[in-house]
Design a protein with these regions (language model features):
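N-terminal hydrophobic targeting signals that begin at the initiator methionine
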Residues: 1-2, 25
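C-terminal motif of bacterial Sec signal peptides marking the signal peptidase cleavage site
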Residues: 20-23
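Mature, Sec-exported extracytoplasmic domains of Gram-positive
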Residues: 26-200
């Protein structure tokens, strides 16, 4: 009986190992990766604007007491969930978590000596929901990221791929001028390929 159980356990282990080995060795069609990546890169420009650039269009006010402006009616998104859904259609869940922390929670950055009073500067959340209204924290023009990098998505090459992760090399332009090739990563998720690195 003991020998039978031992053989059964060994057989199960062998099957599991074979399945794991097969899953690790799965490779995806490069044309599929390139097509999906091109679409994701193009879609990332608008998402980058929401999180790093000028943000969603807002109804501005001259009232100096107001720290946030209401999102305009013609905005493509009007709730946190809509923004999150749009971001997750482009970026991986792991990278999207960084975006959500920055946009909806806020964070601190080191700006001085470790022991100084200004060692950490608190950056407020950019988007806040008050009841059923989404508002945006206006930021100074000089603090808006200059999103001037674009990509030649017709010339994407797959450098490597392993375990549902592909490394790409993509020619880029800065202000329309040819610049260096950028290394980007895409990962396979439950919903398909997603960017796992920023494109700005």
């Amino acid at each position: 009986m003991k020998n039978i159980l031992t053989r059964a356990a060994a057989l199960v282990a062998a099957v599991v190992f074979t399945v794991l080995l097969a899953s690790c060795s799965v490779t995806y069609d490069e044309a599929e990766i390139i097509t999906a990546s091109a679409e994701l890169i193009e879609a990332s420009y608008d998402i980058n604007t929401v999180f790093f650039g000028s943000g969603l269009p807002a109804v501005e006010s001259d009232d100096e007491v107001l720290r946030h402006f209401e999102i305009a009616d013609d905005s493509p998104y009007h709730t946190k969930e809509e923004i999150k859904t749009a971001a997750l259609a482009v970026y991986s869940p792991d990278y999207a978590e960084f975006l959500f922390e920055k946009a909806f929670v806020g964070f601190s950055v080191s700006v001085g000596e470790e022991d100084s009073i200004d060692a950490d500067q608190i950056i407020d959340a950019r988007y806040v929901e008050y009841g059923d209204r989404l508002v945006i924290l206006p930021i100074a023009e000089e603090d808006i990221m200059k999103l001037d990098r674009t990509y030649d998505t017709s010339s994407i090459s797959v450098v490597s791929q392993k375990r549902g992760r592909a490394t790409l090399s993509v020619p880029s332009f800065v202000d329309g001028v040819p610049a260096e090739d950028i290394t980007l990563t895409v990962v396979m998720t439950e919903d398909g390929w997603r960017l796992d690195t920023p494109t700005y």
